[in-house]
C-alpha cells in the first residue's frame, strides 16, 4: 500500500532525526508532496507543505538536518508551502536574516541589510532603508533573489519594495496621535518595569536566593573516559566529548527570543568552536551566563561542518563546567623570580605584568621582579598589580652594557708604525670558547715595510672529531688533522717565530684569547706583544661602512680573498688590508703604536663595543630615579641599533641599584667561556649578584655547538658559583621567563618568526615559562640538594629582603608654578567681563565667576588656565583662530580669559554700548544665538546675543576639584609653532611629547600567525588560529607620540621624578623627545596640554586671507546659512542637481552621509538644534534607536531630546532636582551606567516624563555640549563663506580638506560630473576607501559646477604647488592634486618653472623629475597643449 504524503513527511522527519523537535501539529499534518531529482546536477529538491510556519530556529534545524543526511548523495534544497499564512508578517521578520544569506551580496552588505526595519503589507514586503543610495543598490542587487528566498521558505510574496523613511505614508494623523499615546504608555511601562526589576534583583540578592545559577550544567553528565583530544577531531562525527578552557564566548539573542551561545575552547592540542541553542522551557540561558573566559568546560555533541565559517564545529547536546587542576608551587619555601620579560619586551615577552604578579601571588611567592629588555614601561602596571595582589614588587631592567671605548690597540708599544714588524695571524678552532675548544689551524704572515716577508702555517691535532659545522665552515676534515703535531709544539714554534713583532688580527680578542690561553697552559704567561685589531680599526677609520667583515673589507680595499674561514687565506687577505690601513692611519696623524687608541678614539666609541646583557635592580627610591636616568641616556644619547649603557654611565648612576650578570649573553658568562678563572673572578667583583639560569634555557648553545655538551655546561655553572663564593657575591637562580605556561611558548615563536633579522630565529627557542620553585629546584638537582636550595630559594629571598619598597608612580598632581597666576587669572577674568558686561557686572556674572574662581584657584588650577591662555593668545596674535575641544567651554573663566569662544552662561542679550543685559534663566531658549534680533531699549544699539547654558560642573566636577583637561584645536599648519612655544614658556628640558606604546593589533597578529603556519607547513582550524592571534595581540611593537599632547614638568622637579624619556619609535632624528611611560600612566601626576592640530582653523585662516573678512564678525544666525542645513536652496541649486536634500557637503560636522540623514530627519533651523545634532551624532545609542525614534513618532522634537551630556543636568535642574542629584544622573548616563533606583524615583517625583527616563537608560556615551558648540560655531562660520563667497570656500576646501582628486572628471561639464557621482552612488557598497574619498570630492565639485563655477586643468604656467587658486569663475588646481604626485615633486615643478618655461615633455621630465605616467596623465588632462615630446633645435638657437 502506497504511503500518503503525510506518512512520507513523518518518515523523512524520523530519518533526519528531528521528529522530537517538531511541533506535534506540524509533524502530523506536514506533507512531502514530491522530490525533484537531477542526476546530472546531483540535486534533490524536496517540496513540503506545512499547516503553519516553522519557528525560525526549527526551520534552520530542519534544513541543516536534511542537508547533513543526504550530503553524500546530493545537494539538497527545500521548497515549502504554508497553507495557513495568516501570521506571515511576524515570521517574515524572523526569517529575514536567513533569506538575506541566500542572496549573492557580500558579507558586509548582508550585515548592513539585516539591520533594516521590515513592514509587511499583504503580499508586499517593505524594507526601510536610510537613503536613496541604499534603496537603488539593494533594489538592483538582490530584489529577485530575496523574493525567491522568501518563497522557498513558504511565504506568499508578490514583491519587495525598498523605501526610504521619508516615503512612509502608512500612518494618518489620527493613527499617529494614537501611536504617540501608545509609545508614551509603553515608555512608562518600561521605566516602571525597570524599577520593579531592580527592586526584585535587590531583594533577590538580599535573600541570597540559592536557585541562582553559578555553574553551568546543561544536559547529561559526560563520562571522562569518553574525552578525546581536540587535535584528534578531523572530520564529522556523530558524538564526541572534549574538554577545554574557554578563550572566547559570544551569547546572542535571536529574534525568536531564544539564544545561541558560541564558545571557543582549547585543550592546548587544538581549539574548537562549540555551539548550542537554548531549549524551550529550560533555564539554559542562566547556565550560559555562568560561563566566562578562563573557565574549563566538558562538552559533548555532534561534530559537523559549519557552512558559514567553513570549519568543523561541535553542536553541543551536553555541557558542564569543570574544575581543572591548576599548576601549583608545592615547595614549602618559595623562591623569588628576579628575571622575567613582559609584553613590554618588544616582540619578545608575551603576558602583561599583571598576569605574572597574579600567578606569583597565587603560588605564594613573597616577591617578584620585572626586567624587560631595555625598557621600564611595565612599571606603572606592575605597581598597580602588586598593590592589588599584596605582593612585593621588585623593579628592574635587562639592559645592554658596553665598554665606553673598545681598544683598537692592546698592550701599547713605543714603536713607529712604518718601521714595525707585524705578524698578521688567524686561528681556526673546534669552537668559540678558548677555555673549552682547541686550535686546529694556526696561520700567519710576517709584514715589514709594507710587504709580506715570511709565512707560518700549521695544523694541530685536537684529538677529537670535528663537528659538521666546523668542517663546513673551515673545510678542514678529521683526515687532515690525524698526523698533525700537538698544539703545544705548534705554539712553541709560533712564539719563537713571532719574536717581538706586533700581532694583527681581524677581531683580535678572539684570536688572542686562544693564543694567550695556549701560552699560559705552556707556562709562558700571556703574550706581551703589542696587538692591533683590524675589525675595530676599520669601524673607527671607515665610519661610512655599514659592515666590517673580512669579506666586505676585502672588496672595499680591492684585496683577493680566496677561501674565507681558512686561516692562511684569511691571514693573507688581512695583511694586505692592514698594509693599506697603516697608510690611512698615517694620513690621520697616527704614527706610533702607542698613539692609536688616543688619537683614533671618538665619542661614538660606544657604537663599536659589543653589548653584554646586564640586570639592573632598583634597591630604593634613589635607585629608581637613577635607573630612569640610565634608561633615558641609553635611549636618547647612546642609542645605536639598540639602547646601550656605557659602563661609565652605569658607574655614575649606580647608587641605589643592584647590578646582576644576566643571561648567557652577559659579560660574566662570556668570560667563563673565554677567560681563566682568575679573570672570571676579577670580572665578577663588578657585580652585586650572579645569575645562573636553568640548563633547559642553554640547550640551544649545545645545539649550536657553542658549548660542547651538558657536562661542559655543568662545569660552567660550577665556575660561576665558585666565582660568586670567592668574591662573596650571592649566586641566584633566575628563570628568564618570557611567558607564563609552557603552552604559551607558541606565541613567542610566532612573534620571533615575524622578525627576519632577529638572531633568535636561527635556533630552536627554549622553554622560557614562569617556573615554580619545584621546577627550578629540579633544574639544578645536579648541584646537590643543599646547593640547589641555596641558589633557588635562600639567596633569592635574602636578595629580595635587601630591597626597599619602591613606588614608581607619584600619587598626586604636580603642576608648574607661574608667579602670580592666581591673581592674573582673577584680574583677567574680571577685566574682560567688565569689557563685555560693563563696570557694574550683573549678579549672574559675578556669581558664576566667583563660583569658578573658588574651585580653580582653591585647587591650584589657575596655572593651567594661564598656560592655555598664553598659548591661545600667541596663536591669535599670529593670526590663527583656536577652536576648543572637550568641556572647557563649560567654564566661564575660560571664556573670559579667551581660552574658548563658547560662553556657557544662560542665553542673554548684551548692549555693546551701554552694557545693558538681559538673561533667560528658565530654559526657554537653547542658545543665545537663537534669540531674535533686538535693539537696546536704552540707547538703540543692536544687541549682542550670547550664552549656551552649560553648567560649570561638567568641566571640573560637582566639587570643582577634577583636574582640568583643556584641549585646544590649533590650525594644523600652526600646531608645531604652538608646541615650540611651550619650550619658550617653560624651558626645553621641562616639556616633552606625551609618549604612547604601540602594540600588536589583532589584524597584525593574524598576519603573523598565518605567516608562521604557512612557513611551517602547518594547517590549523579557525578557532586555533583565533587562539594564537589572542596570544600575540597586545605585545609591544613600537613607541610613538600623542598627536598633540605636551607633558609639562614643574620647575621644582625634573622629568626623571616621573618617567624616563626617549625618542618616538627610537627615531634619533625626531624633533621632540617623549615620555617613556605611556602618558596615561602619569596622566594624574603631571600636566598634559592637548595642543591638537585641526583643519578648521587652517581653513578659516585661508578664507580670511582670501576675503579679508574677520571670522569673528561673521553673524552666527544668518538665515541663508541656516537654510542649508535643511535645503540647498540658498546655494542656488536643487536637490536633484546635487543629489542631496541639504546644502552641507563639505561643512565640518555636517557633511557626512550619516549626519546629512540626521539633518533630513530633523530639519534644524537654529544654532541650538545644530548643537543637538552634533551631540547626537557623536554619542553612542543617543540617536539611533533612541532620539531618532522619539522624533519620528512625535513624542518630542529635536530641541527637547537628550543630545549632549550637559542637557541632562540643565534639564533636570529646571525640572526641580537638586544640582548634586542632577549632576550624578548626568555622570551616570554619559558613562553608560544607566540609572539607579534612587535616580529613577527622584526623577519621577519631579515629574520627569517616562520617555526621558527610557532614553537615559539606553545611552552608552555622550558628547559634551561645550565641545559640540565650539564645533558648530566653527562650522557655521565656514558655511557662511560657502553661501556668500563660494569660490573662496571651494578653493579653501579643496586645498585644506580634500586629499584624493579625479581631475579628469572634475574639469568636465556639470552633467558629466553629476552622472559620475550618481554612478558611484549606485556602486557605493563596492567602493574602496580611496574611491569613497574621491566621491566626497566629486560631490563638492558637482555642487560647485551647478552653482556656475568650473575647474580648469592643471596649468604648467599658473598652478601652484599646493593651493587651488581663483581665476575668474574658475579654480586652477595645484600640482599636488595630480594622483601619485608627491610634495617634493610639486615643489620641484614650481622651482623649475621659475628658471624658465618647459620646452618639451622630455624637458619636463628632466627639470622636474616627472615620471612618464604623470606626464601622460597631464597630457590627458589637457595641461600640456602644444608641448612636443622633445625640444626641436632650430638654426636660430645655434
From Swiss-Prot:
Keywords: Cytoplasm, DNA replication, DNA-directed DNA polymerase, Exonuclease, Hydrolase, Nuclease, Nucleotidyltransferase, Transferase. The keyword Cell wall biogenesis/degradation does not apply. One of its GO terms (biological process) is DNA-templated DNA replication. Its EC number is 2.7.7.7. InterPro entries: DNA_pol3_alpha_NTPase_dom (IPR011708), DNA_pol3_finger (IPR040982), DNA_PolC-like_N_II (IPR024754), DNA_PolC-type_N_I (IPR028112), DnaE2/DnaE/PolC (IPR004805), DNAPol_HHH (IPR029460), DnaQ (IPR006054), Exonuclease_RNaseT/DNA_pol3 (IPR013520). One of its GO terms (molecular function) is DNA binding. Gene3D superfamilies: 1.10.150.870, 3.30.1900.20, 6.10.140.1510, Metal-dependent hydrolases, Nucleic acid-binding proteins, PolC, middle finger domain, Ribonuclease H-like superfamily/Ribonuclease H. GO terms for cellular component: cytoplasm. Residues 422-578 form the Exonuclease domain. It comes from the Bacteria. It is found in: Cytoplasm. Its main location: cytoplasm. It catalyses: DNA(n) + a 2'-deoxyribonucleoside 5'-triphosphate = DNA(n+1) + diphosphate. Signal peptide: none annotated. Belongs to the DNA polymerase type-C family. PolC subfamily. Required for replicative DNA synthesis. This DNA polymerase also exhibits 3' to 5' exonuclease activity. This is DNA polymerase III PolC-type. It comes from Staphylococcus aureus (strain Newman). The lineage of its organism: Bacteria, Bacillati, Bacillota, Bacilli, Bacillales.
Amino acid at each position: 500500500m502506497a504511503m500518503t504524503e503525510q506518512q512520507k513527511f513523518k518518515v523523512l522527519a524520523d530519518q533526519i532525526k528531528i521528529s522530537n523537535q517538531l511541533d506535534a501539529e506540524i509533524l502530523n499534518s506536514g506533507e512531502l508532496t514530491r522530490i525533484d531529482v537531477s542526476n546530472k546536477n546531483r540535486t534533490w529538491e524536496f517540496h513540503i507543505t506545512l499547516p503553519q510556519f516553522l519557528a525560525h530556529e526549527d526551520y534552520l534545524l530542519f534544513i541543516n538536518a536534511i542537508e547533513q543526511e543526504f550530503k553524500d548523495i546530493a545537494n539538497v534544497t527545500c521548497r515549502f508551502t504554508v497553507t495557513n499564512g495568516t501570521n506571515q508578517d511576524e515570521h517574515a521578520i524572523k526569517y529575514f536574516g536567513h533569506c538575506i544569506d541566500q542572496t549573492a551580496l557580500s558579507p558586509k552588505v548582508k550585515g548592513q541589510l539585516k539591520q533594516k526595519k521590515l513592514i509587511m503589507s499583504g503580499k508586499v514586503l517593505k524594507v526601510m532603508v536610510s537613503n536613496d543610495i541604499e534603496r537603488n543598490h539593494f533594489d538592483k542587487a538582490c530584489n529577485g533573489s530575496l523574493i525567491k528566498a522568501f518563497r522557498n521558505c513558504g511565504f506568499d510574496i508578490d514583491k519587495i519594495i525598498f523605501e526610504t523613511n521619508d516615503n512612509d505614508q502608512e500612518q494618518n494623523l489620527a493613527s499617529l496621535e494614537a501611536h504617540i499615546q501608545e509609545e508614551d504608555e509603553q515608555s512608562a511601562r518600561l521605566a516602571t518595569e525597570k524599577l520593579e526589576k531592580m527592586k526584585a534583583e535587590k531583594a533577590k540578592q538580599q535573600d541570597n536566593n540559592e536557585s541562582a545559577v553559578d555553574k553551568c550544567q546543561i544536559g547529561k553528565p559526560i563520562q571522562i573516559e569518553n574525552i578525546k583530544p581536540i587535535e584528534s577531531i578531523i572530520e564529522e562525527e556523530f558524538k564526541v566529548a572534549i574538554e577545554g578552557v574557554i578563550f572566547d564566548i559570544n551569547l546572542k539573542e535571536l529574534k525568536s527570543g531564544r539564544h545561541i551561545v558560541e564558545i571557543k575552547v582549547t585543550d592546548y592540542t587544538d581549539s574548537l568552536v562549540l555551539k548550542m541553542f537554548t531549549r524551550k522551557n529550560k533555564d539554559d540561558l542562566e547556565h550560559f551566563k555562568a560561563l566566562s573566559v578562563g573557565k574549563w568546560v566538558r562538552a559533548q555533541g555532534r561534530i559537523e561542518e559549519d557552512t558559514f565559517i567553513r570549519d568543523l564545529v561541535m553542536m553541543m547536546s551536553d555541557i558542564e563546567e569543570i574544575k581543572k587542576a591548576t599548576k601549583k608551587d608545592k615547595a614549602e619555601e618559595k623562591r623569588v623570580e628576579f628575571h622575567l620579560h613582559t609584553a613590554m619586551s618588544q616582540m619578545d615577552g608575551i603576558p602583561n605584568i599583571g598576569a605574572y604578579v597574579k600567578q606569583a601571588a597565587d603560588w605564594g611567592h613573597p616577591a617578584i621582579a620585572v626586567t624587560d629588555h631595555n625598557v621600564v614601561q611595565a612599571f606603572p602596571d606592575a605597581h598597580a598589580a602588586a598593590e592589588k595582589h599584596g605582593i612585593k614588587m621588585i623593579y628592574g631592567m635587562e639592559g645592554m652594557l658596553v665598554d665606553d671605548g673598545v681598544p683598537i690597540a692592546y698592550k701599547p708599544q713605543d714603536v713607529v708604525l712604518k718601521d714595525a714588524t707585524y705578524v698578521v695571524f688567524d686561528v681556526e678552532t673546534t669552537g668559540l670558547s678558548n677555555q673549552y675548544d682547541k686550535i686546529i689551524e694556526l696561520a700567519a704572515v710576517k709584514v715589514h715595510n709594507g710587504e709580506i716577508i715570511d709565512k707560518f702555517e700549521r695544523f694541530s691535532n685536537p684529538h677529537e672529531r670535528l663537528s659538521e659545522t666546523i668542517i663546513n665552515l673551515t673545510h678542514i676534515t678529521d683526515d687532515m688533522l690525524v698526523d698533525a703535531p700537538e698544539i703545544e709544539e705548534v705554539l712553541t714554534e709560533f712564539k719563537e717565530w713571532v719574536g717581538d713583532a706586533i700581532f694583527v688580527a681581524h677581531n683580535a680578542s678572539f684570536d688572542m684569547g686562544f693564543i694567550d690561553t695556549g701560552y699560559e697552559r705552556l707556562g709562558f704567561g700571556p703574550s706581551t706583544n703589542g696587538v692591533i685589531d683590524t675589525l675595530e680599526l676599520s669601524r673607527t677609520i671607515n665610519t661610512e661602512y655599514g659592515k666590517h667583515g673580512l669579506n666586505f673589507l676585502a672588496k672595499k680595499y680591492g684585496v683577493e680573498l680566496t677561501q674565507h674561514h681558512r686561516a692562511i687565506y684569511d691571514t693573507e687577505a688581512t695583511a694586505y688590508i692592514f698594509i693599506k690601513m697603516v697608510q690611512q692611519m698615517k694620513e690621520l696623524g697616527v704614527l706610533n703604536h702607542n698613539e692609536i687608541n688616543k688619537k683614533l678614539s671618538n665619542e661614538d666609541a660606544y657604537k663599536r663595543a659589543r653589548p653584554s646583557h646586564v640586570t639592573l635592580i632598583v634597591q630604593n627610591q634613589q635607585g629608581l630615579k637613577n635607573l630612569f636616568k640610565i634608561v633615558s641616556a641609553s635611549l636618547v644619547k647612546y642609542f645605536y641599533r639598540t639602547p646601550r649603557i656605557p659602563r661609565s654611565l652605569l658607574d655614575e648612576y649606580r647608587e641605589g641599584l643592584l647590578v646582576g650578570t644576566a643571561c648567557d649573553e652577559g659579560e660574566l658568562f662570556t668570560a667563563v667561556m673565554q677567560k681563566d678563572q682568575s679573570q672570571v673572578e676579577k670580572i665578577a667583583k663588578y657585580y652585586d649578584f650572579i645569575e645562573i639560569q636553568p640548563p633547559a634555557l642553554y640547550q640551544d648553545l649545545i645545539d649550536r655547538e657553542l658549548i660542547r655538551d651538558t657536562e661542559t655546561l655543568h662545569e660552567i655553572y660550577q665556575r660561576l658559583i665558585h666565582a660568586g663564593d670567592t668574591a662573596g657575591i650571592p649566586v641566584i637562580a633566575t628563570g628568564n621567563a618570557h611567558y607564563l605556561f609552557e603552552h604559551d611558548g607558541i606565541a613567542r615563536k610566532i612573534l620571533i618568526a615575524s622578525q627576519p633579522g632577529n638572531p633568535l630565529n636561527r635556533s630552536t627557542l627554549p622553554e622560557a615559562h614562569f617556573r615554580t620553585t619545584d621546577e627550578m629546584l629540579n633544574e639544578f638537582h645536579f648541584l646537590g640538594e643543599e646547593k640547589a636550595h641555596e641558589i633557588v630559594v635562600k639567596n633569592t629571598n635574602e636578595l629580595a629582603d635587601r630591597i626597599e619598597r619602591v613606588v614608581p608612580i607619584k600619587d598626586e598632581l604636580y603642576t608648574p608654578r607661574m608667579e602670580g597666576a592666581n591673581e592674573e587669572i582673577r584680574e583677567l577674568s574680571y577685566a574682560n567681563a567688565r569689557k563685555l558686561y560693563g563696570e557694574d557686572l550683573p549678579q549672574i556674572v559675578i556669581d558664576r565667576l566667583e563660583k569658578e574662581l573658588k574651585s580653580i584657584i582653591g585647587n591650584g588650577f589657575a596655572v593651567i588656565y594661564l598656560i592655555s591662555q598664553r598659548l591661545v593668545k600667541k596663536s591669535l596674535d599670529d593670526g590663527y583662530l583656536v577652536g576648543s575641544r572637550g568641556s572647557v567651554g563649560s567654564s566661564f573663566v575660560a571664556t573670559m580669559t579667551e581660552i574658548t569662544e563658547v560662553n556657557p552662561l544662560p542665553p542673554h542679550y548684551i548692549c555693546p554700548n551701554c552694557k545693558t543685559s538681559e538673561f533667560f534663566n528658565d530654559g526657554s531658549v537653547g542658545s543665545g544665538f537663537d534669540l531674535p534680533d533686538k535693539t537696546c531699549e536704552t540707547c538703540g544699539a543692536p544687541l549682542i546675543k550670547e550664552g549656551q547654558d552649560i553648567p560649570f560642573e561638567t568641566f571640573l566636577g560637582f566639587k570643582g576639584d577634577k583636574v582640568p583637561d583643556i584641549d585646544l584645536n590649533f590650525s594644523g599648519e600652526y600646531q608645531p609653532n604652538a608646541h615650540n612655544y611651550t619650550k619658550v614658556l617653560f624651558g626645553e628640558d621641562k616639556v616633552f611629547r606625551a609618549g604612547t606604546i604601540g602594540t600588536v593589533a589583532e589584524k597584525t597578529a593574524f598576519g603573523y600567525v598565518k605567516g608562521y603556519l604557512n612557513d611551517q607547513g602547518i594547517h590549523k582550524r579557525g578557532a586555533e588560529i583565533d587562539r594564537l592571534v589572542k596570544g600575540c595581540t597586545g605585545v609591544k611593537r613600537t613607541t610613538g607620540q600623542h598627536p598633540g599632547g605636551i607633558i609639562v614638568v614643574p620647575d621644582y622637579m625634573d622629568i626623571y621624578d616621573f618617567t624616563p624619556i626617549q625618542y618616538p619609535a627610537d627615531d634619533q632624528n625626531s624633533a621632540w623627545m617623549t615620555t617613556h611611560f605611556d602618558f596615561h600612566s602619569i596622566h594624574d601626576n603631571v600636566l598634559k596640554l592637548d595642543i591638537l592640530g585641526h583643519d578648521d582653523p587652517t581653513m578659516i585662516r585661508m578664507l580670511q586671507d582670501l576675503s579679508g573678512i574677520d571670522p569673528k564678525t561673521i553673524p552666527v544666525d544668518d538665515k541663508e546659512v541656516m537654510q542649508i542645513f535643511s535645503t540647498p536652496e540658498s546655494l542656488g541649486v536643487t536637490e536633484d542637481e546635487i543629489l542631496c536634500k541639504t546644502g552641507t557637503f563639505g561643512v565640518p560636522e555636517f557633511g557626512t552621509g550619516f549626519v546629512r540623514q540626521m539633518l533630513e530627519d530633523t530639519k534644524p533651523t537654529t544654532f541650538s538644534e545644530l548643537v543637538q545634532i552634533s551631540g547626537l551624532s557623536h554619542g553612542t545609542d543617543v540617536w539611533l534607536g533612541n532620539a531618532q525614534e522619539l522624533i519620528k513618532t512625535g513624542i518630542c522634537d529635536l530641541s527637547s531630546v537628550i543630545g549632549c551630556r550637559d542637557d541632562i543636568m540643565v534639564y533636570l535642574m529646571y525640572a526641580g532636582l537638586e544640582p548634586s542629584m542632577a549632576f550624578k544622573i548626568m555622570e551616570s548616563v554619559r558613562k553608560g551606567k544607566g540609572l539607579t533606583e534612587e535616580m529613577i524615583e527622584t526623577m519621577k517625583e519631579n515629574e520627569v516624563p517616562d520617555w526621558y527616563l527610557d532614553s537615559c537608560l539606553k545611552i552608552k556615551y555622550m558628547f559634551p555640549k561645550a565641545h559640540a558648540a565650539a564645533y558648530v560655531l566653527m562650522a557655521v562660520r565656514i558655511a557662511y563663506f560657502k553661501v556668500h563667497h563660494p569660490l573662496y570656500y571651494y578653493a579653501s576646501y579643496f586645498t585644506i580638506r580634500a586629499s584624493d582628486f579625479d581631475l579628469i572628471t572634475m574639469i568636465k561639464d556639470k552633467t558629466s560630473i553629476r552622472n559620475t557621482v550618481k554612478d558611484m552612488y549606485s556602486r557605493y557598497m563596492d567602493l574602496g576607501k580611496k574611491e569613497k574619498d574621491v566621491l566626497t570630492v566629486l560631490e563638492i565639485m558637482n555642487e560647485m559646477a551647478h552653482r556656475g563655477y568650473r575647474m580648469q586643468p592643471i596649468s604648467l604656467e599658473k598652478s601652484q604647488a599646493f593651493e587651488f587658486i581663483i581665476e575668474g569663475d574658475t579654480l586652477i588646481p595645484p600640482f599636488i592634486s595630480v594622483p601619485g604626485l608627491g610634495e617634493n615633486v610639486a615643489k620641484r615643478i614650481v622651482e623649475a618653472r621659475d628658471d624658465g618655461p618647459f620646452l618639451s615633455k622630455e624637458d619636463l621630465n628632466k627639470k622636474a623629475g616627472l615620471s612618464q605616467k604623470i606626464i601622460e596623465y597631464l597630457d590627458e588632462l589637457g595641461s600640456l597643449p602644444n608641448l612636443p615630446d622633445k625640444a626641436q633645435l632650430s638654426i636660430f638657437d645655434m
